[in-house]
A protein has these predicted regions:
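Acidic catalytic/metal-coordinating carboxylates
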Residues: 36-39, 59-68
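Active-site residues of response regulator receiver
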Residues: 9, 55, 84
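Conserved sequence signature across two-component system core domains
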Residues: 8-9, 34, 52
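Recognition helix of helix-turn-helix DNA-binding domains
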Residues: 170-205
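Active-site beta3 strand of CheY-like receiver
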Residues: 47-53
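The feature encodes the CheY-like receiver
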Residues: 14, 54, 59-62
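Short hydrophobic/Thr-rich beta-strand motif most characteristic of the beta2 strand and flanking loop
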Residues: 27-35, 43, 200
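Short, flexible helix-to-coil linker/hinge segments that flank and couple to helix-turn-helix
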Residues: 92-97, 102, 107-158, 162, ...
Length: 220
């Protein structure tokens, strides 16, 4: 299967560099480029890509607005991989809320870019470790929630709630399996059921819900 990609970035040099890297792969094909959010929406409508590489800061409609439009209401759409820099932390949380499936620093090495594209195309979520730390620092500064387990999570069984807590901490299936003394297959099955029950697109949205609800706290 070939992964169809749209590149949305207002800098032509960045788009050209990304295309050169991606088009060298047998399983990835760049089907369109866009210089702003409006052009990205048109390219997605025309080419139906699997993944959109989305810059945040673009003229006219920015990448955050474009992501919200693409994924509004949780409807099916391409997986959005946000390209960001260390100066754009304030946008990351909003992009997570909008439904982006992955976040990658623009200065990441070639191998990390290819891994990220393949990971989100496969239906998984990806968050650069450096960005994870910065997001957790932001959550630390927020006042803790005192609402208890939200109604949305009450649909989960006790075991599913344990697995969800692991997902919300960003732990892998293998790590959750070791924590709960379960098989990887069982954890994978629980994770799929949890995302479906909670109407979440992927694990990144599970992280958002876990921290927003106060079920998981940084360092907890």
């Amino acid at each position: 299967m070939t992964i169809r990609v749209v590149i949305a970035d207002d800098q032509a040099m960045v788009r050209e560099g990304l295309r050169l890297i991606l088009d060298l792969q047998n399983d990835i094909k760049v089907v369109a480029e866009a210089a702003d959010g409006h052009a990205a929406l048109r390219a997605v409508a025309e080419h139906r890509p699997d993944v959109v590489l989305m810059d945040i800061r673009m003229p006219g409609m920015d990448g955050l607005q474009a992501t919200e439009r693409l994924l509004r209401g949780g409807r099916p759409g391409p997986r959005v991989l946000v390209l960001t820099t260390f100066g754009e932390d304030e946008y990351l949380y909003a992009a997570m809320r909008a439904g982006a499936s992955g976040f990658l620093l623009k200065d990441s090495p070639r191998a990390a870019l290819l891994h990220a594209v393949r990971t989100v195309a496969d239906g998984s979520a990806l968050l650069d470790p450096a960005l994870t730390r910065r997001l957790l620092e932001e959550w630390v500064r927020r006042p803790p929630s005192r609402a208890g387990v939200p109604e949305q999570l009450r649909a989960l069984s006790p075991r599913e709630l344990e697995v969800f807590a692991g997902l919300a901490r960003g732990r892998s299936n293998a790590e959750i399996a070791a924590d709960l003394v379960l098989s990887d297959t069982t954890v994978k099955s629980h994770a799929a059921h949890i995302l479906a029950k909670l109407d979440l697109r992927d694990r990144i949205q599970a992280v958002v819900l876990g921290y927003e609800s106060g079920l998981v706290r940084p360092g907890g």
